[in-house]
Amino acid sequence: MNGSGSQGAENTSQEGGSGGWQPEAVLVPLFFALIFLVGTVGNALVLAVLLRGGQAVSTTNLFILNLGVADLCFILCCVPFQATIYTLDDWVFGSLLCKAVHFLIFLTMHASSFTLAAVSLDRYLAIRYPLHSRELRTPRNALAAIGLIWGLALLFSGPYLSYYRQSQLANLTVCHPAWSAPRRRAMDLCTFVFSYLLPVLVLSLTYARTLRYLWRTVDPVTAGSGSQRAKRKVTRMIIIVAVLFCLCWMPHHALILCVWFGRFPLTRATYALRILSHLVSYANSCVNPIVYALVSKHFRKGFRKICAGLLRPAPRRASGRVSILAPGNHSGSMLEQESTDLTQVSEAAGPLVPPPALPNCTASSRTLDPAC
């Protein structure tokens, strides 16, 4: 984060220089370890559920998959290194990682915010123009949008490759900002505008219009249909994810603005506040799988299937009849049935109710023919 490369070590040494016990040296790594564990397992499960059987085929699924990739990259590539700031006085990972870690932090942050903005537009089109938007909301266009998202993220985070550097300071090896104060202030302001302020404005506008449309155009006939319930449910889930992103990253950006445009003295209280802002912003990368599990029953079922498959031994080879019937239990993706055109009705009427036998099935029909 901004200034986190060396200021953490400097503040730790300044505030804890009396030789007393430093609680942040123990408590902060524990919280980081919890974030790392929950985030790694949760996002890995999300990716496994969406990729299992090629289920990430809808636009919403692809965007959620991309969000999971960004969160997992942040957890694996950034959190372990940032945790050492509060436990070690020195930066021990070398000059290359000093630049790369901070670059990846802002790369994944931009990718997450742009993805949330894109999925908010996707939800608005799916709700407001369900028929006319089908030609636009295709997997191919979603992949193109994801490529554009990462391209923009690289563009806006690229300068951070030179923002930080490793150097010696008072017999310590530190990773600290290398730019002058005016350049850093301009860069931090641009980061706030493009990675937070503009995406939040897009999220607010699209979801406000989506909710307004949903509540003003409730049709008593179609409101209770499986398709409408599914679209409302997945929209609610994405709104929760977007709100959590805004809330989790708000303290970090507010703190940075206070440093540059207000008064932020280096005291024990402000140091604790900076640690808290880091923890809250980092925790955003592990809360999305929890939201999916709480809101989406399809994700819960997918999580249970993945966990059950990991815990139980490999099953024996199934017979031909079982192998044909098995795919029927996975006819829809975990989120696809909730997101666009597929509905929850297919789940209730498909896997649980066997299809009736056709009257013209004869002995010539093979036993493996699913129609018989």
UniProtKB/Swiss-Prot annotation:
It is found in: Cell membrane. SUPFAM superfamilies: Family A G protein-coupled receptor-like. One of its GO terms (molecular function) is neuropeptide binding. InterPro entries: GAL2_rcpt, Galanin_rcpt, GPCR_Rhodpsn, GPCR_Rhodpsn_7TM. GO terms for cellular component: cilium; plasma membrane. Residues 353-372 are annotated as: Disordered. Residues 1-28, 82-99, 163-187, 259-260 are extracellular. The chain crosses the membrane at residues 29-49, 61-81, 100-121, 142-162, 188-208, 238-258, 261-281. It comes from the Eukaryota. Residues 361-372 have a biased composition (Polar residues). The keyword Glycoprotein applies. Disulfide bonds join 98-175. Keywords: Cell membrane, Disulfide bond, G-protein coupled receptor, Glycoprotein, Membrane, Receptor, Transducer, Transmembrane, Transmembrane helix. It is a multi-pass membrane protein. Glycans are attached at residues 2, 11. GO terms for biological process: adenylate cyclase-activating G protein-coupled receptor signaling pathway; adenylate cyclase-modulating G protein-coupled receptor signaling pathway; G protein-coupled receptor signaling pathway; galanin-activated signaling pathway; inositol phosphate metabolic process; neuron projection development; neuropeptide signaling pathway; phosphatidylinositol metabolic process. Residues 50-60, 122-141, 209-237, 282-372 are cytoplasmic. Receptor for the hormone galanin, GALP and spexin-1. The activity of this receptor is mediated by G proteins that activate the phospholipase C/protein kinase C pathway (via G(q)) and that inhibit adenylyl cyclase (via G(i)). Belongs to the G-protein coupled receptor 1 family. This is Galanin receptor type 2. It comes from Rattus norvegicus.
